[in-house]
Regions:
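Mobile cap/lid helix-loop segments that gate and shape the active-site cleft of serine hydrolases
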Residues: 62-72, 91, 97-141, 147, ...
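Short, proline-enriched alpha-helix->beta-strand connector loops that line the catalytic pocket
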Residues: 79-84, 143-149, 183-186
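Primarily recognizes the serine-hydrolase "nucleophile elbow" in alpha/beta-hydrolase
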Residues: 27-103
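C-terminal catalytic histidine-bearing segment of alpha/beta-hydrolase fold enzymes
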Residues: 149-164, 170-216
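Solvent-exposed loop/turn segments at secondary-structure junctions
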Residues: 4-8, 52-56, 92-95, 156-158, ...
Length: 219
């Protein structure tokens, strides 16, 4: 999808800036659902995928409560924003700087999402922006009624250690998988050397999951 970037959100005065791309993603999903009959789509069996920021957006959609407005005069806005599944690559699973620092000490990503700049300023601002973190961090939104997700990373985890690429470390995946397990949500985690790998990549997962018999709807 084509969505607004953080710089566009800042220029438009959207607060926090991350709201713009995430709500654009939700609107795109609603638009696709509104065209389900015309485009011969199953409105229930819709998954999301993406890499890095697109992965974070996909997980946000997977875990966020439905943003549909059934009373809206806009027929697109009445459509559900819930997913059947999500399969993502290199996802940032949290936007909480404290969690990032604990999982990967040399973390440096995320402050721009809330308009607070560099990572030290992000940490300092955490308490002030905590309501935003609770609304926009995928980890914070996980609940038992959420759809299954699949996470792929290019390197194995090293929790508590500095990483070469802390923005795309599989440490994010390990901690989300633990959290999902505690909530009763299926979360497949794949990285080099990962155990019990059923699907080698996100595409294989989506084909298998979206093609299976529907057990329960997520809309």
């Amino acid at each position: 999808i084509n969505y607004r970037l953080i710089r566009h959100a800042e220029a438009e005065g959207v607060t926090p800036p991350v709201k713009a791309p995430l709500h654009d993603a939700a609107r795109a999903l609603q638009f696709v659902r509104s065209k389900a009959r015309e485009w011969n789509l199953d409105p229930v069996r819709i998954g999301a995928t993406g890499g890095s920021a697109g992965a974070c957006s996909s997980l946000w959609l997977a875990f966020h409560d439905d943003l549909a407005d059934p009373r809206s005069a806009d027929p697109v806005a009445r459509e559900s924003t819930r997913l059947f599944c999500a399969a993502v690559n290199g996802a940032q699973t949290t936007l909480d700087p404290q969690q990032m620092k604990e999982w990967t000490p040399n973390s440096r990503y995320g402050g721009h999402a809330f308009g607070v700049g560099a990572f030290p300023a992000f940490l300092t601002a955490r308490e002030r922006i905590l309501p935003w973190i609770h609304e926009y961090s995928p980890y914070a939104l996980v609940s038992a009624d959420d759809p299954p997700v699949y996470l792929f990373y290019n390197t194995p985890p090293a929790l508590g250690q500095d990483e070469k690429d802390p923005t795309h470390t599989s440490n994010f995946g390990v901690k989300l998988q633990e959290h999902c397990a505690a909530k009763g949500v299926r979360c497949d985690l794949v990285y080099p050397g990962a155990p019990n790998v059923k699907h080698a990549n996100a595409t294989a997962y989506l084909i298998a999951t979206l093609g299976r018999q529907i057990g329960r709807a997520h809309v």
